Each structure stands twice: as C-alpha cells, then as structure tokens.
C-alpha cells in the first residue's frame, strides 16, 4: 500500500492510497488491469475520494483523481479537529474517531490517516476495527465525515441557540 501525496494547482492535496493489479482470465490467457484509490482535499474541510480502473497505472490514477475532485464534501471542523466522537461502518470495516487536544496529531492508521490529512484534520484519535481493506475504510471514513454536523447546523434544526446546544452536550 503506497501513500504518495502531492499538491496541485488550486490548493488541492492529492494522495494515492493504493494501486492494485487485477487479472481477468480469458481463452487466450490473462488480461491485466489496474485499480487506484485516491483522496483529494484542500486542507480546510473539503475532501473527496475516487476509485479508478484502467489498463495502465497512470490512467487508473488519473481517473481516480478526477472522480475524487468531482465527489468532494465539506466537513465541519473545530480548530483542526472533529466536532464530536463518531462511529461508522461500511461493509466489514468499522471505524471510531474522537476529537483530540491541540498537539496530539493524527493518531490513525493506513487509509483513514490519508483521508484525515487531506481534509485538514490536525488532531484526532481514530481506530479501525474489522476489515482493513483500504476501499472499505475510506468509504466508512467518508460516510462518517459526511454525517457530521456543526453546532450551528444542529441549533438551526432544533430551533435553538448555538449556546444552548453547546451547554447541553459534549460538542
């Protein structure tokens, strides 16, 4: 599993999480193709992931990056960390993420770490349970980040003041 990161124009950070070679057996032999999993983010709460497949590695990476740019979401951050503790799952991967104090860093493994880095999360404690398949872990992480709400959004939904929400919760 490789983790190649680079900055591109428009202040987007791109990270290649994994490249897999897959083969299809036909009458004449095997046909090899490649799949790439990438994440893209601006470092300020916007993040997206993409999965691309092609006959050659560069084409697969390019397709994955393009899909990642098209599927970006906004994550409500709180001073470089999460708003509150969250859990989530996708197929066999279960994840737990918890906000951390300043200076902690990103305590997360593998694919989840890449997603959090490009999203702009600087302090978080995270753990993956079950399957550590990079695709499932990235999807679970994205689902959890997408479901997070800021205190302002919660207050608006409940017709309350932000102050009331923050007083009565662990946000």
Curated annotation (Swiss-Prot):
Q: Which domain of life is it from?
A: Bacteria
Pfam families per the UniProt record, alphabetical = Ribosomal_S5 (PF00333), Ribosomal_S5_C (PF03719)
- Give Gene Ontology CC terms: small ribosomal subunit
- What are the recorded GO MF terms, alphabetically? rRNA binding; structural constituent of ribosome
Secretion signal, residue range per the UniProt entry: none
What PROSITE patterns does its record include?
RIBOSOMAL_S5, S5_DSRBD
Entry keyword annotation includes rRNA-binding: yes
Q: From its record, what is one biological process in GO terms?
A: translation
Domain S5 DRBM: from-to ranges: 12-75
InterPro entries in UniProt: Ribosomal_Su5_D2-typ_SF, Ribosomal_uS5, Ribosomal_uS5_bac-type, Ribosomal_uS5_C, Ribosomal_uS5_N, Ribosomal_uS5_N_CS, Ribsml_uS5_D2-typ_fold_subgr
Which keywords does this chain's UniProt record carry? Ribonucleoprotein, Ribosomal protein, RNA-binding, rRNA-binding
Whether Ribosomal protein counts among this entry's keywords is yes
Give the family this protein belongs to, as stated in its UniProt record. Belongs to the universal ribosomal protein uS5 family.
Domains (record comment): The N-terminal domain interacts with the head of the 30S subunit; the C-terminal domain interacts with the body and contacts protein S4. The interaction surface between S4 and S5 is involved in control of translational fidelity.
Q: How does it assemble?
A: Part of the 30S ribosomal subunit. Contacts proteins S4 and S8.
Role = With S4 and S12 plays an important role in translational accuracy.
**Record-linked PANTHER family:** MITOCHONDRIAL RIBOSOMAL PROTEIN S5
The protein's name is Small ribosomal subunit protein uS5
Q: What organism is the protein native to?
A: Buchnera aphidicola subsp. Baizongia pistaciae (strain Bp)
The record lists the lineage as: Bacteria, Pseudomonadati, Pseudomonadota, Gammaproteobacteria, Enterobacterales
């Amino acid at each position: 599993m490789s983790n190649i990161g680079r900055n591109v124009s428009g202040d987007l950070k791109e990270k290649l999480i994994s490249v897999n070679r897959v083969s299809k057996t036909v009458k004449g032999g095997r046909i090899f193709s490649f799949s790439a999993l990438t994440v893209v983010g601006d470092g300020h709460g916007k993040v997206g992931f993409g999965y691309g497949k092609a006959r050659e590695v560069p084409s697969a990476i390019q397709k994955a990056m393009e899909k990642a740019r098209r599927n970006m979401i906004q994550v409500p951050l709180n001073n470089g960390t999460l708003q509150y503790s969250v859990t989530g799952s996708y197929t066999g991967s279960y994840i737990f993420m918890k906000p951390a104090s300043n200076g902690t860093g990103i305590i997360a493994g593998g694919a989840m770490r890449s997603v959090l880095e490009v999203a702009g999360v600087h302090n978080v404690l995270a753990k993956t349970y079950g399957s550590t398949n990079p695709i499932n872990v990235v999807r679970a992480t994205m689902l959890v980040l997408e479901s997070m709400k800021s205190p302002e959004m919660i207050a608006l939904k409940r017709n309350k003041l932000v102050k009331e929400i923050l007083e009565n919760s662990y946000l």
